[in-house]
Amino acid sequence: PYEGEHPWADVPRDQLRPEYKSVYQQCLKLYMDHMREKGWADKIVLYISDEPHFSHEHIRVQMKALCTMIQEVEPDMPIYSSSWRHCPDWNGAITVWGAGSYGCFPEEVLRERAAAGDRFWFTTDGQMCTDTPYCAIERLLPHYCFKYDVEAYEFWGINWLTYDPWK
C-alpha cells in the first residue's frame, strides 16, 4: 500500500499510495453496491485486522489510514478488529471492537465507546485452550454478551486446520 519495497521501514504509514487507495476504494464501492442491490448491506462487517500489535506506533498510524480510506467511500461501514484491548488512537476508526472477555478491555471504556456509537463483540483465542485457567469460559460468553450488551462473540478456531483433511 506504500511507495517503495516491503517492509517499508522508513515510509510514513499514514500516506497510502494513491493507486492503492483508488483501486481499494473502487473495489469496496462495487462490492457494497452489489450488497445494497441484494439487500444484504446491513449484514456486512469489514474485518480489518486480527490482533493488531498496536503497541507499535506504525501499526496505530497505518490502521487509522486504512480505516479513513474505507470511511471515505463507505462512511457507515462497520469496521471490526479483534484488538482485545482498547486503543484510544482508533476511536472513530474502529467501530466494532473485538474485546477480550476476561477483563482486558475496561468496562468503563466499553460503556464510553458504546455511548459514542461503537459496537462490541467478544473475541476468543488462546485463553480457551485446555491447559489454561480460563478453560470452559466459553460457556459464559452468552451471559457476558447479555450483561455487557455485547452483540456477538467471535469464536476463533472453529475450523482452523493444521493439516490437510483430504489426505
Where are these regions (language model features)?
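Catalytic-core regions of glycoside hydrolase
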Residues: P1-W166
